[in-house]
């Protein structure tokens, strides 16, 4: 079942106060977990309602989805004419947004800034930022309203504070995979990953498919110890991605448009094929941060 809730923010004393709809600084949709045995009976509408995040960005707003799968929050912040803040809320029972959480951000839009406790970080397109647990103030702005930044966010619970780190795309750990012959030539850019920096449990990166390639994560896999969220973008007009999900012997698909995200439970495969090449951001949290801790599946074994 899907619940949509409006967030509240705290006043100067840390007291939760309800506010008028027009003043709400961000929106949160809560998604409860689902079982694989149930999911194989879902209709297309139910599958989309459970796993698809249709709207990630809206001007001067923060659109967030809270999944009870490992309690990840995925969403987007798109400041245009004003700054947008992430603040404490009743859903998190916290005085500040990152009171008990860590966060990763990748900017897919124009140049912008993120202020963390008064320290500003400039992010151009494809730059990333890790913010450790305990940061008190988070503010997002765009340099040019005509070309606004689009900050894609993943955040999950944390147990320790690690330093805030800016990760330019040039500093990401790069893993070329696939080939032209198999239509899956791509580069995995690992931003928040033990090979680059320390975090509690969040891993986050961006995979870029080469022109002429349209398959991601194929051969596919599952990883029982981590859930994952995919965010598809850089998809050309009038093109789509067929995102594959479900247990390996009970596969289903979701039609994804540009700048949409999808929740992948730990029991589900997660792969896709587009009608053109595209880019996607992946974020994981769970039991460990071992990127290669996965159960690979031969394509001929899929059903």
Question: Each predicted region: which residue ranges?
Answer:
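Double-stranded beta-helix
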Residues: 145-186, 281-303
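Acidic, low-complexity central loop/insert segments
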Residues: 109-148, 152-157
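A short glycine-rich, His/Asp/Glu-containing loop-to-beta-strand
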Residues: 60-92, 185-228
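Conserved metal-binding segment of the jelly-roll/cupin
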Residues: 123-142, 255-276, 285
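Acidic/His-leaning functional-site neighborhoods
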Residues: 66, 198-269, 274-277
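Hydrophobic, proline/glycine-rich low-complexity stretches
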Residues: 26-89, 93-94, 102-103, 302
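Short, Lys/Arg-enriched N-terminal segments with co-localized hydrophobic residues
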Residues: 5-25
């Amino acid at each position: 079942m899907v619940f949509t809730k409006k967030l509240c923010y705290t006043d100067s004393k840390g007291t939760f106060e309800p506010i008028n709809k027009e003043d709400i600084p961000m929106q949160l949709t809560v998604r409860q977990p689902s079982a694989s045995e149930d999911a194989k009976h879902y209709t297309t509408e139910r599958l989309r309602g459970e796993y698809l995040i249709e709207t990630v960005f809206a001007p001067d707003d923060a659109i967030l989805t809270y999944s009870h799968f490992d309690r990840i929050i995925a969403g987007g912040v798109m400041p245009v004419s004003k700054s947008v803040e992430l603040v404490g809320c009743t859903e998190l029972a916290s005085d500040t947004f990152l009171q008990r959480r860590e966060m990763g951000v990748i900017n897919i839009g124009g140049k912008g800034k993120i202020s963390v406790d008064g320290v500003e970080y400039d992010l151009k397109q494809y730059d990333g930022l890790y913010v450790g647990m305990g940061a008190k103030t988070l503010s997002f702005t765009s340099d040019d309203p005509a070309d606004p930044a689009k900050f894609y966010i993943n955040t999950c619970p944390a147990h320790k504070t690690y330093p805030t780190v800016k990760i330019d795309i040039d500093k990401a750990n790069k893993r070329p995979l696939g080939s032209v012959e198999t239509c899956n030539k791509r580069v995995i850019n690992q931003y928040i990953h033990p090979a680059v920096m320390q975090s509690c449990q969040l891993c986050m990166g961006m995979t870029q498919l080469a022109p002429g390639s349209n398959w991601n994560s194929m051969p596919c896999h599952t990883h029982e110890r981590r859930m994952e969220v995919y965010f598809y973008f850089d998809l050309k007009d009038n093109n789509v991605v067929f995102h594959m999900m479900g247990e390996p012997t009970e596969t289903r698909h979701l039609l994804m448009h540009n700048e949409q995200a999808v929740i992948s439970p730990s029991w589900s495969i997660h792969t896709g094929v587009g009608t053109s090449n595209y880019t996607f951001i992946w974020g994981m949290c769970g039991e460990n941060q071992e990127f290669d801790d996965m159960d690979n599946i031969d394509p001929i074994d899929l059903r």
